[in-house]
Amino acid sequence: MQTQLGENDISLPQYYNNRELSWLDFNYRVLQEAYDKNNPLLEKLNFISIFSSNLDEFFMVRVAGLKDQVKMGYDKPENKAQMTPQEQVDAIQEKAKKYVDTQYERYNELMIELKDYEIVMCEPHELSEPLLSKLERDFKLTILPTLTPLGIDAYHPFPKLNNKSLNIFVDIDTEDAINSAIVQIPSLIPRFLTYNEGAKQYVVMVEDVITYFINYLFTGYEVLNTFTFRITRNADLTIHEDGAEDLLIEIERFLKERKSGSAVRLEVDGRTENPDDLDWLIETLEVDKQDVYFLNGPLDLTFIFGLVDHLSHKLNYLTYEKYSPQIPRSLGNNNLYELALKRDIFFHHPYESFEPIVDFIREAADDPNTIAIKQTLYRVSKDSPIIKSLKEAAEKGKQVTVLVELKARFDEENNVHWARMLEDAGCHVIYGMTHLKTHSKIALVVKRIGGELTSFVHLGTGNYNDKTAKLYTDMGIITTNEQIAEDAINFFNYLSGYSVKPEYNKLIVAPFDIRDVFIDRIDKEISSHLQHGNGKIMMKMNSLTDKAIIEKLFEASQAGVKIQLIIRGICCLKPGIPGISENIEVVSIVGRLLEHSRIYYFHNNGDERIYLSSADVMTRNMIKRVEILFPVEDKEIGKRLVDFMDLQLSDNQKGRYQDEHGHYHYVENNLSPLNSQVYLMQEAIKYGQELKKRSAQPSGMPVVSKRRANWMNRIRRSLKK
C-alpha cells in the first residue's frame, strides 16, 4: 500500500515505543527462553540468570538516570513516546515488577523440575541430622570467620553497603532494648553449598545458612527477627573529563565513587514479617516504596550461572549440545595474509571461528616484516591473547598503537589494567576521545612485502574478545583495499592526534556522517521506489532509537518502500500502523546466541548498497560515539549477507514479530520449523566436514562439491516440507 507523503504527522507519540519500556520487553523475551520446551533444563535456568543480570544493569544505569532527573525537577518529556521522567519511572516499576514476579514463578517451577534429577534446593532445617552437622562444621570453618555484624545505634551509623551486596537485617533483644544490626555477606564466599546423600545432591543458599546459625554472631543475645535484602545503586555517575590531567586516575576515582552511589532499588525476601524494620530501611536508604521488590525466592538469581556450571559436569545432557566454531568458509585452508592480498575475507562468528582474527594479530606480532599494528579495543577478555600479541609486538620493536576505551561501561577497571600493561610494554596507548566513546572495531597491520608497504585492515561489528566471540553473533572483513587502508591510516591519525576530521574514501564515521548517510540512502530508496516500484530496505541491529532515522523510515513506508528490520533489543518504532508504517515489519530474534551483528541493506534498483557497522541506529551511536560504517563491495560476501537476513526473517522458532501496538508475538505458521541459529551451526559444521574431506584427498585429484545448490533455495525447499 502506498500513502501520500506527509498525509499523517509522523512525530505523534502513539507511533513510538518508549525506549525504557521497549528494553524491558526485550528482557522479557530473554525470560521467555526459560519457557521454551526446546531448551534444555539447565539452559532455561541460565536464561533466568541472564534476565537478572540484565535487569541489574538497567536499574544501575537507566533507572538511576531517570531518578536523577526526577530529583532535579526535570519534567521535560522524551522526544518519541513523550513520557516525562516520572511517568517513565512509574511505568518501569509497574512493568518490571510484573516481569520479576513471572521470573520467580518460573524459577520455582524449574527448581521442582530439578528434583527429577536428584538435585534438591533446600533450607538448612530440611537437611538430615548428619548433613546438618556437616553444614554447621563448614559454617564455623569457612563462613563464620568472614562475617562482621555491624550494629546500628548512636555509636554505629548505618554502614556503607556496596552495590549489589547481599545483606541480612537482624533484630536483637539486648535486655535493655531491641537493637538492630546488619550482616553483609562477603561477595568472595560461595553463594551456595552442596551436600550429597544417597543419590541426591542438596543445594543450600549461603544466606539461609548464615540466618540459620545467626546466633553464633550474637552470643548472649536473643535474635528476634531476620530478613535478607539487597541494594542496587546508581552506577550512572559522571566521569569528569574536562580538566582531567590523567584520565586513568579520573576513571579510578569514578570506580570508587560508583560503589556507593545512591540506592535505586531495594530487593527484599518476600517472607519478611517486620514492616517497621522495612520502613526504617526504606527511609534510611532514601528509596521510594515503589522501589521495593518482594521476591519469592533467593535474591540475586545471577547465582544460577555458578549453579549451572556446577551441575553441568554431572548433568551435561541438560545443556546445549557443544558447538565448536568452524573454519570460515571465506578462508578455508588458505593462509590468511596471502589470501587477503587476492580478495576480501569474510567472517561470521561464532558459527565461524574467531581464531583467525586472533591469528591476524599474533602473526603480525611474530612477522619481522610487520612495521606497525594499530587497533581499537572496547571490551576484551580477562586473559586476552590479542593483548598478549600486541605487547609482544611492541617488545620486538614494532610500532604499536592501541586505543583502549577507558569509558566502556562496567569494563573500565579491566581496561585501565590493560592500558597500563600495554604502556609498560612500549605500546602507544590512547585512552579514548574527550566526551566520546570509541566503539568502532578496527585493526590495521602494515607490512613490508616485496619492498613496498602493504596495509591489511580488519573491520568488524563486534569486540576483539575471544570469549564473547563464542556467544555473540558478529561479522567482520579483512581487506587490502587501498582506499580502505588509506581511510584506516587517517582514522588512527585522527584518534591519536589533534587532526581535524579526515575526508574518507569509503569508511563512514560517527559522530560526523553515519546518520547523514543513512538518511541520504533512505531518501534515495524512496526516489528509486517512486520511479521503479521496487524499493526495499533491510536493517539488522541491536537497537533502534534515533528519531530522525525512524521518521525517515516512516516516510519511506508511506512512499511504499518495503522495510524489514531485524532488531534484537530496543525498538522505538511501531510497525504496521496504517498510513504511517504499514510497510515496515520488525522481528526480534532471541536464542542461544546473542544477536550482535549490524547490517544495513538498500536495494537501490538492483545496484545494491550493503554495509556492516559497529553502530546501532541509536542516538548515542550517531552523535556520542566514534563508530565505523563500512561498505561491503564483494558480490559474494554481499549475497551471503542478504541470504542471512532472509534466513533470519524466515525464523519461525526464535523470531518474534512486533505488532502495531508494540507487542511481540512468536511467529506462527505451518512451515517446517526453522531456527536460524541452529541452521547456521549445522551449515558451518557441514562445510568444516567437507573441508576435511578435501584436505584428505590425494594431491591432484579433482574435488566435486556437493554444496552447489543455492543456500536459500535449500532453505525454501525445507520450509515447504
From Swiss-Prot:
Domain of life from the UniProt record: Bacteria
GO cellular component, one term: polyphosphate kinase complex
GO biological process, one term: polyphosphate biosynthetic process
Domain annotation PLD phosphodiesterase: ranges: 434-468
Binding site for Mg(2+): 379, 409
Cofactor field: Mg(2+)
Pfam families: PP_kinase (PF02503), PP_kinase_C (PF13090), PP_kinase_C_1 (PF17941), PP_kinase_N (PF13089)
CDD domains, per the entry: PLDc_PaPPK1_C1_like, PLDc_PaPPK1_C2_like
HAMAP family per UniProt: Polyphosphate_kinase
Record protein name field: Polyphosphate kinase
